[in-house]
Amino acid sequence: ITGERHAILKGFEQTAILPFGGELWPLQVDANADVLMTFIPEFPIYPPETAWMREPKTDIPGLILNTLSNGSRIVYMPADIDRQFARYNLPDHGNLLSNIIKWTLKDELPIVVSGPGLIDCSLYKQPGRMILHLVNLTSAATWRAPLEEYIPVGPIKIKIKLEDHIQGEYPTLLVSGQRIIADVEKGWSTFQITSIANHEVVVLT
């Protein structure tokens, strides 16, 4: 991590190094862009007495961001941090990706999900309704396959910014066959799902 502490680096105040074991290719960076992270070449991890950084800093960018004249924010990751998170599920990678999304969208997120476990969320829009797919990735097979058992997680609190003409007062849970009551305020629908075993689909109309 280089330069001043940016909002994207929130939560990493106690360190200047993040783990990485993926692919990264050198590239030329525009003069107006900011480089928040640079690559540290690999070094031995065993035996312990040799585990130290031979080259603690390079000019190889790992995370680049820019703000255009119209206010649009752009983040480019030469380092495949997203693929590393999908593969190894390291919390540091997940937190960094979360910060990147929040900064790029200026904290104007269309959905906020909170609760235990690892939940994959996909929000879709169709005429007259919004559909949220929730997949529970928390399992006994987190580090190996095949999946041994479902581990239900919950409660899951969900807050969705409603599209025009969507009331969002009574979300329908297609998998569990329930219809629940949501709290609708200032264009947001907030509700809670008690438990998700493997998959749930929420429909807002």
Regions found by a protein language model. Name each.
Residues 1-205:
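A conserved amphipathic helix/loop scaffold
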